[in-house]
Amino acid sequence: MEQIIIQIISATIGSIGFALVFNVKRDKFRYVITGAFLGITTYFIVDYLTHSTFLSNVIASIVCTASAEFLARWRKAPATLFLIIHIIPLVPGGSLFYCMRSFVLKDQEAFKSYGLSTLYSAAGIAVGILVVTSFLSILYSYKRPEQR
């Protein structure tokens, strides 16, 4: 449990670094970091309950995308500003590194294992983003009766 808390804090600090690199303005800074914290915390909770990399990434990216879309409308800023920083902690950088390392060292078994882990993570993130953006697109495509 202690290791998970350290990973959550580290991921949040890493998101702060990316927020600084992307020049996120002060009035949006705390919202961007809070979303990243929520996303990685959701990931670890779902991973603890299900032990599924794919499902953990799907649900965490749904939380990240929904919060990014909400914040974009509330703070009147592009959703990608929030979404990129929210998703950063979910990106499977470690497994991608070890996948490529195994490939270079010609360790086929490790390459396959890390490669599948990377693909599951990336696909989970993509599916989560797709679900929320598609839902919101359909939702906002219908005009309210009084606006017709």
Where are these regions (language model features)?
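Internal alpha-helical transmembrane segments of multi-pass membrane proteins
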Residues: S52-I62, L71-I88
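Alpha-helical transmembrane segments and their membrane-interface boundaries
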Residues: M1-V63, Y98-R148
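Non-catalytic interaction surface on structured domains
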Residues: F44, E69, W74-F82, S95, ...
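Hydrophobic alpha-helical membrane segments
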Residues: I85-Y98
